[in-house]
Amino acid sequence: GFLSTVKNLATNVAGTVIDTLKCKVTGGCRS
């Protein structure tokens, strides 16, 4: 349903943001 789609998008965005912050903090960017 719509809510689960929104939840999945929010989870993906949060994961991306967290990965980016970790990467900047540790200097271990892969991209």
Curated annotation (Swiss-Prot):
InterPro entries per record = Antimicrobial_frog_2
Question: Which keywords label this protein?
Answer: Amphibian defense peptide, Antibiotic, Antimicrobial, Disulfide bond, Secreted
State which tissues express it: Expressed by the skin glands.
Record-level GO cellular component terms: extracellular region
Write out the annotated subcellular location.
Answer: Secreted
One GO BP on record is:
defense response to Gram-negative bacterium
Disulfide linkages recorded for this protein, renumbered to the chain, are C23-C29
Q: Which domain of life is it from?
A: Eukaryota
Q: Cite a single Pfam family from the UniProt record.
A: Antimicrobial_2
- Name the family the entry cites: Belongs to the frog skin active peptide (FSAP) family. Brevinin subfamily.
Q: What does this protein do?
A: Antimicrobial activity against Gram-negative bacterium E.coli.
Could you identify this protein by its name? Palustrin-2c
> What is the protein's species of origin?
Lithobates palustris
